[in-house]
């Protein structure tokens, strides 16, 4: 980027051009065109970037991308990233990490967002995303009608290689009675990610109930629109994966970079966003921080329980519910703390430090330090301890995922609808793991 700058208090950017990240120097390099980022030049760079970002407005209008990024579909996010890559000549961007809708993207938080892209590249993208959010305007419309979303000219070759086809609009089903919907059910089950805002605006979410979480052909979800606003097919455009129907994600960043209480979505047989992060791993990948292996060529069918039952290599040394497999099954992306706890709880070799009490979904951390150590190892956080882990657990309280059992030390209970998600009753899992009721009971 080249800019003629008046260094007087009335700072003015006269001209901005396309930015090539390779032009940005390291502290030991000399560059006459672009100054080093110092506290005094930070605002200057921010203004220059903002001026360059203005070029995205034409792209928004051309593709019908809403101005509020929280209302973006996965296709809109994809178009935005591709625009930025071309506009700034960005290097090393892993497009798979951005396969989510705008609500999920905005809900990540800065720290988690920056993990999606290389150094400085993430800062560029985050700066633009923040600017777009602060504008806080309604989605772009033409004559009061929601626009169609033509395919970006940047996307055809790359995303076809990942099996992603043109967006398919799925019409809303008939409204159903919402009175039996709980927040935890809503949190752990498939939802239409296109209409959701970030978790900061959770009170504005529509209530959702799943007609059949195991539909093998089409996505069928009932919507309850708030403020008498009925969702239209345009609001529910979702990418379709030709190599398998995959799950979606909205996420929530907590203290110590916990990937806590991400909104979980469809099983393999469901259709939504977050396409290329859906995985069916081998057991060899369960102790890896990396994403598990890619989907097989065939389309997996059935429930998570069916998947586990069909595993020929399942034995007493392997967890019944491996966290990586559950993350892939739900499409939640990186392994979440609650998924990791389920892995430990369904691994007989871990019963010395964490186990079910025998009372439903209640469990006890017999050695909380060992649980924290293993979580830190899994997330590559060597300073992890129980104090930090418990802070992560507390983020689940308000979400009705996990609650602390009153009067019992290190005892917690899953209060969400795990049975519908996993296909197991707690009694079935207890029998498989030879769990005996806690003597304290």
From Swiss-Prot:
One of its GO terms (cellular component) is nucleus. Transcription factor. Directly controls the expression of cytokine and chemokine genes in a wide variety of different cellular contexts. May control the differentiation, survival and proliferation of lymphoid cells. May also regulate angiogenesis through regulation of expression of genes controlling endothelial cell migration and invasion. It comes from the Eukaryota. InterPro entries: Ets1_N_flank, Ets_dom, ETS_fam, Pointed_dom, SAM/pointed_sf, SAM_PNT-ETS-1, Transform_prot_C-ets, WH-like_DNA-bd_sf. This is Protein C-ets-1. The gene is Ets1. Residues 418-422 are annotated as: Helix H4. The modification Phosphoserine is found at residues 251, 254, 267, 270, 282, 285. GO terms for biological process: angiogenesis involved in wound healing; cell differentiation; cell motility; cellular response to hydrogen peroxide; estrous cycle; female pregnancy; hypothalamus development; immune system process. Autoinhibited by a module composed of four alpha helices (HI-1, HI-2, H4, and H5) that flank the DNA-binding ETS domain, reducing the affinity for DNA. Phosphorylation by CaMK2/CaMKII in response to calcium signaling decreases affinity for DNA. The keyword Membrane does not apply. SUPFAM superfamilies: SAM/Pointed domain, Winged helix' DNA-binding domain. Belongs to the ETS family. The modification Phosphotyrosine is found at residue 223. Residues 130-243 are annotated as: Activation domain. It is found in: Nucleus; Cytoplasm. The modification Phosphothreonine is found at residues 38, 265.
